[in-house]
Amino acid sequence: LDTVPHIEMYKEYEGRIRWLRPEEAQRLIDVARPHYFADLIIFSLNTGLRQGNVLGLKWNQVDLERKVAWYHPDEMKAGRALGVALNDTAIEVIKRQTGKHPTFVFVNKRNNPITDINSRYWKESLKQAGIEDFTWHDLRHTWASWLVQRGVSLRILQEMGGWKTLAMVQRYAHLAPEHLHEHAEILQSLVGTDDTNRAHRRN
């Protein structure tokens, strides 16, 4: 061949992951408290829901007794119905919204449905909290990262977050390398140990 044929190599997409440490998240919540979206931040960090799903949440989708919020397929990015397990913190946030609006759970300071997060308030809160390079969607990344770091499997994370495929949550796998320890131990006796221990392992 005079020339080497060009072959397109498949590159797996690795989306940007930016997540907060718990103390950073608490700092953000504290500075946001004067604004209506402090509860939105808390709710997002405890459910992993996308902004549109949080803002569009209606009272008829919430079952406080069963501690679940239901979303229809046409409301979800993956096109599949999702039942969101609500922890006690998320339940407390929802209860604080009681009586503000007959249809929507979350409203602004005028008790009107929220169509979008006020970017000025959001940027001001980030600046006051000393947080850089962070978007609202990164609250979802933070939620997922915290779960994986605490031992939740990627399969369960996929189900909880409503991702369409397991490949979509592989981006978080590096946050929980504990399962690789037993494989790393294989090489521990080859170098860097004293002569007595090496001899003992050979025998």
Regions found by a protein language model. Name each.
Residues 8, 42-44, 70-72, 86, ...:
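Short beta-strand segments
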Residues 61-68, 132-133, 152-171, 182, ...:
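Short, polar N-cap/turn motifs at the start of nucleic acid-interacting alpha helices
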Residues 2-55, 65, 76-81, 100-101, ...:
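Basic, Lys/Arg- and aromatic-enriched nucleic-acid-binding interface segment
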Residues 66, 75, 87-132, 203:
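Active-site/catalytic core of tyrosine-dependent DNA strand-transfer enzymes
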Residues 42, 46-53, 140-164, 171, ...:
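C-terminal catalytic core of tyrosine-transesterase DNA break-rejoin enzymes
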